[in-house]
Amino acid sequence: MRRLGPLLLLLAACGSPTEPSHPTLKFENGVVFGIPTLPITAVPGTGTIVVSGVIQTLSGGFSLFGDFHVGPANALTVKVDVYLTGPGFNFLTQNFYRASVGSLPPGDYDVTVTHVLHDPAPVRTQQAFRGTVHVN
């Protein structure tokens, strides 16, 4: 009977449920020089998909912001919003971005990347990439 108490405590400690992790986004961007453009890519990893690409803007006064949504049937949408946030220099500018979506369960994902250009008006939405990516 003495062994039953510690055994029950051990089983209770080992069998406690944990909350599933929620997908996360790390978004980085910056201006690049010397390249006209780069293809948009979606590269899988262990629990991650890294999307990267370039958006050309009319000047250096634009800022990029990232967002994402995981929908039903593993549909992953990465949205890159582009806003005019300052005067910048008046020449075509290449804005590189990298969006790393993490904490994804393994499986095939239908990945869509959308660019939303807010300035100058009117707002324009472009589907920049679509493909299936397998996450380990």
Identify the residue ranges that each predicted region occupies.
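C-terminal motif of bacterial Sec signal peptides marking the signal peptidase cleavage site
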Residues: 11-13
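Positively charged n-region of N-terminal signal peptides that target proteins for export
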Residues: 1-4
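A short tyrosine-centered beta-strand micro-motif
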Residues: 107-113
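Hydrophobic residues positioned within well-ordered beta-strands of beta-sheet architectures
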Residues: 51, 95-99, 111, 131
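An anionic, turn-rich surface loop/hairpin at beta-sheet edges
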Residues: 79-105
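Beta-strand-rich extracellular modules
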Residues: 114-118
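Primarily secretory-pathway and cell-envelope proteins
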Residues: 15-79, 120-136
